[in-house]
């Protein structure tokens, strides 16, 4: 029925010796959650490797950094988003952007690309040429290996990012940050995001509510610049969010 106060430190030492740690709650970066990534037939990125890297860099490395509230990171291997990255404070999912020139299309009577597109983003125009509606495309990459004449190539592979997802008593779907980001860009964005949240969030305020209060466009503009990195040490050293915040 609980651990007596005087046994807390011995308990921590005992489970640390077994390879476990305590302290996964409170106003801080939480343990990272991911899907199985490339083990799945739909997976575009190695989510487990990325999850481990983010875990070590931000959950362990920034474990003592106090934030206004919990900060959950979710990683999906593709746009199917089985673990619902958009409902996490910081969401990540794999992207494979198609590169296609309609002039390369042979006008096959039976288009193999249309058959595999889950978003109905591909269609045949009046001239019998396949077209891709970019407004419908979610960059799942299925089409890039579907054309029998290799008319569709991969323009870019990387990660999509969403900000400020909340689920529970109140809900907020994460806001998509424009662009597809490389591995290094992604890690930099996570770092800048945490710094901005620590600096500009109010104690007890969920990240998504901070983004809305600051202004989505304003926050994303700050996020995509490197100005906050010039204030990194100042932000980390500041006496912020010492009491209150997340209760679980």
PLM regions with names:
Residues 22-27, 64-70, 199-213, 229-237:
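Flexible, glycine/charged-enriched surface loops at secondary-structure junctions
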Residues 16, 20, 59-63, 119-122, ...:
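Generic secondary-structure signature for well-ordered alpha-helical cores
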Residues 4-11, 18, 214-227:
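Terminal amphipathic helices with adjacent charged low-complexity linkers/tails
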Residues 167-202:
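A hydrophobic, small-residue-rich beta->alpha segment in the mid-to-C-terminal subdomain
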Residues 110-132, 142-158:
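Iron-sulfur cluster-binding cysteine motifs and their immediate structural context
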Residues 89-94, 159-168:
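Short beta-strand elements
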Residues 1-110, 116, 135-136:
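Small-residue-enriched alpha-helical segments and adjacent helix-cap loops
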Residues 221-248:
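Long C-terminal interaction/binding lobes of large macromolecular proteins
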């Amino acid at each position: 029925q609980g651990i007596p106060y005087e046994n807390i430190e011995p308990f921590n030492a005992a489970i640390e010796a077994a390879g476990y740690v305590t302290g996964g709650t409170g106003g801080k970066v939480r343990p990272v959650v991911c899907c199985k990534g490339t083990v799945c037939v739909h997976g575009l990125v190695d989510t487990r490797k990325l999850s481990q890297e983010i875990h070590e860099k931000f959950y362990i490395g920034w474990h003592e950094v106090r934030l206004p509230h919990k900060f959950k990171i979710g990683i999906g291997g593709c746009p199917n988003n089985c673990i619902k990255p958009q409902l996490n404070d910081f969401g990540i999912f794999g992207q494979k952007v198609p590169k296609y020139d309609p002039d390369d299309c042979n006008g096959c009577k039976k288009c193999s690309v249309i058959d595999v597109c889950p978003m109905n983003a591909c269609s045949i125009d009046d001239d019998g040429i396949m077209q891709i509606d970019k407004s419908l495309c979610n960059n799942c990459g299925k089409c890039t290996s579907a054309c029998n004449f290799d008319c569709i190539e991969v323009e870019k592979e990387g990660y999509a990012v969403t900000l400020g997802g909340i689920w529970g008593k109140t809900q907020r779907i994460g806001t998509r940050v424009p662009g597809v980001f490389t591995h290094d860009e992604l890690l930099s964005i996570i770092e800048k995001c945490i710094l901005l949240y620590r600096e500009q969030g109010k104690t007890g305020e969920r990240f998504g509510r901070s983004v809305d209060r600051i202004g989505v466009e304003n926050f994303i503009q700050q996020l995509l610049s490197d100005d906050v990195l010039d204030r990194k040490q100042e932000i980390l050293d500041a006496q912020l969010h010492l009491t209150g915040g997340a209760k679980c």
